[in-house]
Curated annotation (Swiss-Prot):
Gene3D superfamilies: 2.40.50.100. Transmembrane segments: none annotated. InterPro entries: Ribosomal_bL27 (IPR001684). This is Large ribosomal subunit protein bL27. It comes from Anaeromyxobacter dehalogenans (strain 2CP-C). The keyword Acyltransferase does not apply. GO terms for molecular function: structural constituent of ribosome. Keywords: Ribonucleoprotein, Ribosomal protein. Residues 1-22 are annotated as: Disordered. GO terms for biological process: translation. The keyword Acetylation does not apply. Disulfide bonds: none annotated.
């Protein structure tokens, strides 16, 4: 009896689906409160005005309005939701 299995029989066979992360709403698009703006791991994009962050770093709109992306002095990417407009 062989001590090892045939070559690679049980180690292959995985091809996990992607996790659909990324920017879901782009700048100057209109959103409703609760809309997901960004799905991410860690804070690649930081929450700005009227944007909340979930425990998995998902950013979402807190109010109805228009999305605006910007950079801070420290070169951080920030997403905000501007009311009205």
């Amino acid at each position: 009896m062989a001590h090892k299995k045939g070559q690679g029989s049980s180690r292959n066979g995985r091809d996990s689906p992607g996790q659909r992360r990324g920017i879901k709403v782009y700048g100057s698009e209109k959103v409703v409160a609760g809309n997901i703006l960004v799905r991410q791991v860690g804070t690649l994009v930081h929450p700005g005005q009227n944007v909340g962050m979930g425990k998995d770093f998902t950013l979402f709109a807190l109010i109805d309005g228009t999305v605006k992306y910007s950079r801070t002095r420290g070169d951080r990417r920030v997403v905000s939701v501007l009311p009205g407009a």
